[in-house]
Amino acid sequence: MNKALFLCLVVLCAAVVFAAEDLQKAKHVPFKRAAICFCPGKPDRGDLWIFRGTCPGGYGYTSNCYKWPNICCYPH
């Protein structure tokens, strides 16, 4: 009985370690909370960020246009 309890504890600890590792990877993946938008003179679609004055960093945005009170950000 003692060995079975120890084995269960080892398996539980391993599961916690692997679950925590997956959560650390998930924190570094950028997640966009933007809608689709289009600006005059731009052939592609952009990302519409609601109630923002500037484009957020970390997404590779290089240009934008304002659609008050929102901003449309373009990655290329």
Curated annotation (Swiss-Prot):
Alphabetical keyword list: Cleavage on pair of basic residues, Disulfide bond, Hypotensive agent, Ion channel impairing toxin, Nematocyst, Neurotoxin, Potassium channel impairing toxin, Secreted, Signal, Toxin, Voltage-gated potassium channel impairing toxin
Gene3D superfamilies in UniProt: Anthopleurin-A
Disulfide bonds: 37-72, 39-65, 55-73
InterPro entries hit by this protein: BDS_K_chnl_tox (IPR012414), Myo_ane_neurotoxin_sf (IPR023355)
Subcellular location: Secreted; Nematocyst
Superkingdom of source: Eukaryota
Signal sequence bounds: 1-19
Cleaved propeptide residues: 20-31
Predominant location category: secreted
SUPFAM superfamilies, per database record: Defensin-like
Pfam families associated with the record: Defensin_4
Tissue specificity field: Moderately expressed in the ectodermal tissue from the distal and proximal tentacles, body wall, and oral disk.
GO molecular function: ion channel inhibitor activity; potassium channel regulator activity; toxin activity
Gene Ontology CC terms, in alphabetical order: extracellular region; nematocyst
One biological process term in Gene Ontology: regulation of blood pressure
Family: Belongs to the sea anemone type 3 (BDS) potassium channel toxin family.
Stated role: Blocks Kv3 voltage-gated potassium channels. Reduces blood pressure.
Record-given protein name: Kappa-actitoxin-Avd4d
